Structures are given as structure tokens and as C-alpha cells.
């Protein structure tokens, strides 16, 4: 390790992507398995640092990324950190992301929804924010509920083959199957 960036000029979007992936796919499984430890401390600090760098102004407030994979990773991380720690910052960040992707924009208006790894994270992340809202913020839940339901219903309508397996990607507006390959991470979406 050189303790240097791979590029001469660091790219904040790339750094945020790497941090979100590391937090969700690297640190979260460890802290969920062993509980409080240096791994949890690392995840908490990494998440705080990501939100300190939030550079995208949205109607919901500043968020670290407009990319649905990154936002989905961060939704899952902040939701679980909130349940684990009770720290209101994580709850606020999760709701800020969910507000942006459920209330101020809609995945149903996009040209593509990925239903496999590197795209479907937003679906699970939004569902985790919905669980949190249903428990802690009933008014927010009432606004989220029809939108998450419409998203999940549309995925079932256009995103599955006759056997109920998910395609890799679909256009939610037109119903066009963009990638007929079958998602090997279907459980992520069906867990939502």
C-alpha cells in the first residue's frame, strides 16, 4: 500500500463510491455478526465522513451521491447503524436519502432500474428506510408507502420472467427489458 490515491487528482465521487461499497459489503456484515467492535467504530466514522463530504444539493438536503447504487448502499448502512446505535444522525441521513429518491424524484421515471448487484441496492435501501419510517415517523411513512409500493409493484409487473425470476435491468416507464439475463442477486430485491 502506498497511502496514495490511484489518480493524481482525487475524484470525490469515486472516493464516496468506494467508501459506500466498503461500508455496506465489507464492514456491515462484520458488525452485524460480531456486534460492537473496532469494525463498527470504523463503519460509523466512515459513514460520518461520507456525509461530511455530501456535495449534491437536492430538495431533501445535501446528499453524498446521486448514483442509485451509492445511495442504496448508504441507505442500508445508515438504517442499520441507526437501529444498532440509536444515533439520530444516521436516521436523519437515511431519511434524507429516502426523501430524495421517494418523494423528490422517482425511480419509475428513470430509463433504467437495475435489478442485480450494482443497481438494486437502492430498492433494499429504500425498503429499510420505509421500515424505519413505519416505526418512528408515521407521517413520513404515509408519504413513502404509496411510492415504495408503486415501485415494487412495477418491478413485479415488468421486471420478472414467467417463472418470477428477475431480469438484470428494465425500463420502468416503457416496460422494456434492457438486459434479459437473470439477476443472481434476486433475493436483495425480493427481500424489499
Please name every model-derived segment.
Residues 1-192:
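Glycan-recognition and catalytic cores of secretory/periplasmic carbohydrate-active enzymes
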Amino acid at each position: 500500500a502506498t497511502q496514495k490515491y490511484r489518480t493524481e487528482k482525487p475524484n470525490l465521487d469515486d472516493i464516496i463510491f468506494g467508501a459506500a461499497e466498503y461500508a455496506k459489503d465489507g464492514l456491515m456484515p462484520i458488525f452485524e455478526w460480531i456486534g460492537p467492535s473496532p469494525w463498527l467504530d470504523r463503519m460509523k466514522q466512515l459513514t460520518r465522513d461520507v456525509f461530511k463530504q455530501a456535495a449534491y444539493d437536492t430538495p431533501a438536503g445535501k446528499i453524498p451521491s446521486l448514483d442509485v447504487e451509492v445511495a442504496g448502499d448508504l441507505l442500508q448502512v445508515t438504517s442499520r447503524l441507526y437501529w444498532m446505535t440509536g444515533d439520530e444522525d444516521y436516521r436523519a441521513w437515511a431519511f434524507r436519502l429516502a426523501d430524495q429518491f421517494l418523494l423528490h424524484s422517482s425511480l419509475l421515471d428513470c430509463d433504467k432500474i437495475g435489478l442485480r448487484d450494482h443497481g438494486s441496492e437502492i430498492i433494499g435501501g429504500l425498503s429499510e428506510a420505509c421500515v424505519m419510517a413505519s416505526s418512528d415517523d408515521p407521517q413520513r411513512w404515509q408519504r413513502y408507502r404509496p411510492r415504495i409500493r408503486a415501485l415494487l409493484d412495477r418491478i413485479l409487473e415488468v421486471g420478472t420472467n414467467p417463472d418470477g425470476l428477475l431480469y438484470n435491468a428494465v425500463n420502468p416507464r416503457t416496460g422494456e427489458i434492457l438486459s434479459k439475463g437473470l439477476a443472481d442477486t434476486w433475493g436483495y430485491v425480493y427481500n424489499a
